[in-house]
Amino acid sequence: RCGVCEKVCPTGAIRFDQEDRIISENVGAIVVTTGFNVLNTDFFPEYGYGKYKDIITGIQFERLASASGPTLGEIRRPSDGKIPQKIVFVACAGSRDPAKGIPYCSKICCMYTAKHAMLYQHKVHNGESYVFYMDIRAGGKNYEEFVRRAIEEDGVNYIRGRVARIYEKNGKLIVKGVDTLLGASPVEIEADMVVLATAGVANKGAEDLAQK
């Protein structure tokens, strides 16, 4: 190491000769950031993840959209490398589902799904994107405006309702759900790709750590 950063640091925060020491402080509370995991996709077999190659998770879509990802930022289907002309995003994939033991909202899914849908529209200009959601929970500064931008400026189609089943037919993914804003009317979309916004769950060991 050259040590230049230590010399030029205006606050003296860099010290290469500093030794380990134990510090004791009296505090009012301790916040431990344990992180989280995403829900195992085997949790909802009705969505067909693992059975159909073109059903992926939000994390996998993030890699596809990244310039350093496997497709160099191009949105392409895992099955054949073609650009999907119609894509469905399923928010709350596992979240807010008391029947399966996850009654809570994962909080992050609404926003990263909106971002993913916008990225898709920016990269596939003639493509169609649909988002199935339960409620829009945009809990942050300018978050609501961000979602409205996805809808009004980028043309993302939002459908308020749950997806009941996804299956493949004649090379297309059939997404069956309902639109609760239209009186729970059945909705069926033929998609080229489906992205699941899987629920966030507590990190392994977090409960044990809380007892210590």
Please name every model-derived segment.
Residues R1-K212:
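Residues forming the flavin
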